[in-house]
Amino acid sequence: DTTAGLPVEEPPRIALTFDDGPNARYTPMLLDGLKKRNIRASFFLIGENIEGNEDILLQMRKDGHLIGNHTWDHVQLDKIPAEKARLEIEKTNNRIYEASGIYPSYVRPPFGAWIKDMELSVTMLPVFWDVDTLDWQSKNIDSILSIAQKQVHDGSIILMHDGYQTSVDAALKIADLFY
């Protein structure tokens, strides 16, 4: 595309990803904001957080978001026996299926700690990230936006969380900037 003979700069293609949900208070706000912008994201869910939030999973599915696994209770997989790690993932997969009718194909290992051999035993692909907004730590919209603006490039996978108001607000501002 060109405008007056000048190339039109395309915004970078990015993936917004959210860990640790679903959160009864903040995830619905995030889903509403994404829907208004016609944006699909990836949500990596903690199994024990699904109880009582099944309607949120159904909304995620209805809106076309990717639903992934983030273990049952946010354990660092490379610090526990392989069988326990497999069960963390399997239990969460089963709970996601019970709540949404789909088995996830992707897993986001907490802390990015993945055991390569697990791909064979759980038949899932790990999803990592290259932009960590540290939203869970700073809980500051300006700080989160600054990190995103400095680090995002075409193909970036942005790590955020859907359990804080500041994260929801920052995510929607990031969406407005890059989509």
Predicted feature locations:
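Active-site beta->alpha N-cap acidic-glycine motif
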Residues: 1-80, 84-91, 95-98, 102-103, ...
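Catalytic domains of cell-wall/extracellular-matrix polysaccharide-remodeling enzymes
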Residues: 29, 51, 75-179
